[in-house]
Amino acid sequence: DATSAIAVGADVSDTEAIRGLVERAEAEFGPVDLYFANAGITGPPGLGIAESAWDQVLDVNLRAHIRAANILVPGWVERGSGYFVSTASAAGLLTQIGSAAYSVTKHAAFGFAEWLSVTYGDQGVRVSCLCPMGVNTPLLYAGKNSDTELGALATRAVTGAGAVLEPDDVAEVVLRALEDEHFLILPHPEVLEMYRHKGADY
């Protein structure tokens, strides 16, 4: 049944958990053709955060993508097809006021997706990188309830920069982009113009 789905809890900071997720999906539905690396956390704002906090954000926002690619891409190359979708952020193209760890890891996630595309694109592996701005999820408002001004500023900066989209609207944009196999997926079109301004300002 093409509409069937299962929910599996997994800690993406654990390679074996991701491997188990892939194996469960394959057991239920057959080979994995499309993988969304979508987990993300913000991390504490500002400088001076503990190295353990940096490690946690790196594990979820970046290394989880690397782990999944290590598990899936060799098989995709062997059979000549597969699709890896990485959720980064507009912060991966611009920057994020507030959490340095979030901004750095989203830049890195974008870079890893681009590397995957350049390296394996001619071997049948397609890659897209989703870089939304404000989306109406709890993650967006994490800084609003922060006990620091910098954390609250991060939320205000994102919500003030453009429309806050509903998750369903973002999903529609993603589905259309995947049909056309676009690498860069921008649910907020204004992000592209901001990115161009950023490049021109250096």
Question: Could you say what each language-model-derived stretch is?
Answer:
Residues P45-L58:
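Substrate-binding pocket helix/loop in short-chain dehydrogenase/reductase
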Residues V118-P189:
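SDR active-site lid
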Residues N38-G43:
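Conserved NAD(P)H cofactor-binding loop of Rossmann-fold oxidoreductase domains
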Residues G9-G20, E51:
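The beta1-alpha1 cofactor-binding region of Rossmann-like NAD(H)/NADP(H)-dependent oxidoreductases
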Residues I49, T95-S103, W115:
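Active-site loop-to-helix junction immediately N-terminal to the catalytic Tyr of the SDR YXXXK motif
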Residues A69, T105:
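Active-site helix of classical SDR
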Residues S89:
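Residue(s) in the substrate-gating loop at a strand-loop-helix junction
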